Amino acid sequence: SLAALKELDTGNGQQIPTLAEVFESIGQDLFINVELTNYTTKDDNLVEKVVEVVKEYKQEENILFSSFLPKNLKRAAKLLPEVPRGLLTLNNFGGWLLRSFLFGFGNYQALHPNWKNTNQFNVKRVRCMGRRVYSWTVNDPDQMRQLADWGIDGIITDDPALATKVLRTN
């Protein structure tokens, strides 16, 4: 429940924010990746509930939806077609299949490979398709620089302050 999550400490007394709290705090200042992945309850109303919050806070131009589940991205496209969507891919055979072949047939504006599966060739290939590449989860400064040198559009990180510092100097 939300109440139980609010009791957790994520470090330094910080609590897990709701999406509404994130939008209230930094919604107009940053471009935010909103992940729509629900592994155990794939047929719940996650997408619809997130779309409601996005509309309420008028964040359509400030976000990107991403998910490992193409079905969720398809649902998001029907509800908010103007919001770009990125397909997340795992570091396994299924992820390779999605990255290599199936991605080209989906209605996605971006590919989100694990940083271990990101290389200069794949970045160029996806960019030639007119789509963007955002790699996850990149927390190492050297890896951030390498990805930037390859022309990646952005990174998904646990440390936005570090990424901002590294990418501004690159």
Residue ranges and their predicted role:
Residues 1-90, 106-109, 113-115, 127-129:
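Metal-dependent phosphodiesterase/phospholipase catalytic core, i.e.
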Residues 11-14, 21, 87-170:
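C-terminal active-site rim and adjoining tail of enzyme catalytic domains
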